[in-house]
Amino acid sequence: YKLFWRQRDNWFNGKKVENIILMFSFIRPFIFNLDPEKAHDLAIKSFKYNFLPSSLFSVQGEEILNTSLFGKEISNPIGLAAGFDKSAEVYNEIFKIGFGFVEIGTVTPKQQFGNEKPRVFRLEKDQALINRLGFNNDGSDVVRKRIEANIPSNLLGINIGPNKDTDNMTNDFLKCAEIFFPIGDYITINISSPNTKGLRDFHNEDDLKNLLSKINEIREKSNFKKSFLLKISPDLEDSQISGIVNLILEYKIDGIILTNTSNKNRESLIDVNSKEIGGLSGKPIKELSTEFVRKFYKELNGKIPIIGVGGVDSGESAFEKIAAGASAVQLYTGLIYKGPNIVKEIKKDLIQILKSKGFTNINEAVGSSLN
């Protein structure tokens, strides 16, 4: 591995680029024989070694994907979802494989281990994951110091949540919000993980109103302008959507992420791990999350950006969410199954789709399937 890292520039010249991409297909079975969390740790270490030059992931004609999000220009609307770089260790290295933006976290006020292991399960036959991690991270103070010492090179979101043992979840959100006000580009209020008991109660109107009103209070007192997003569960009832949208607009939330992992939707799964408890991500929730994008877009009428996440692993699946109303998309499970070249492939395919449909910029496609 160290020898490969030293010689990486030679390996990535000319036709050897194809050899390296092929190499990942050989490495994948070895990685998938590892425990999922050990494989994740290996991926983080690989990014720290910075052995993949950014030139490998450049795409011709990417200008058609240029957009802006929360006041910042980005090269493309493909983002890495929260959950991969939980404690802000490698976000700048992740940008180098082509992501337009990265979201770190979920970060809690205090460091915590999370739930007992094993807690991550691959569903290879379903191209999915089930996790019950429980917000394992290094804590807000450590994460803030890392970001301050390593200025983000592109749009960085910070996903926040409460500690498992807290006696006041709202206060935990407020603590994290105040800590991260001065850094990053946006803060995501994560009320949708199925792995922290009581967290999804914030989808109830009274609980959500109380939380958002207090977030607004500290935002108004702060000297820092910061965009706030809300990350929503895919296990909502349709009857809850209008109430949530009204509160989002009332309290001037700047964006919404649709959706987190699902506690349901197991009927079509065939993998042996499909019975595990936890949040389901990947292909099995692709249509579900896209439908939520469509429903929220209609309710919001384009007033704030939607970030679509859930089953994005190709240019086609990215375009489906954008056409349904997403201004940008995120992925995570697709990266696990397809490797670091997935971002380049999505961008190449997305460029071709846009051109074939007569769009001159990605923004023209947002909500196009509804117009």
Indicate where each model-derived feature is located:
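Alpha-helix-loop-beta-strand connector modules within alpha/beta enzyme cores
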Residues: 128, 138-153, 205-225, 277-304, ...
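Glycine/Thr-rich beta-alpha phosphate-binding loop at enzyme active sites
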Residues: 44-60, 194-207, 241, 245-302
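C-terminal helical cap(s) of enzyme catalytic domains, especially alpha/beta-barrels
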Residues: 112-127, 267-278, 336-359
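Catalytic cores of alpha/beta
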Residues: 89-94, 236-248, 312-329
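Active-site glycine- and acidic-residue-rich loops that bind
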Residues: 162-174, 201, 230-249
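Glycine-rich phosphate-binding active-site loops on the catalytic face of alpha/beta enzymes
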Residues: 103-112, 191-193, 255-263, 318-345
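A gly/proline- and charged-residue-enriched helix-loop-helix capping module
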Residues: 105, 110-155
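Glycine-rich beta-to-alpha transition loops that act as phosphate-gripper elements at the mouths
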Residues: 82-85, 232-238, 305-316
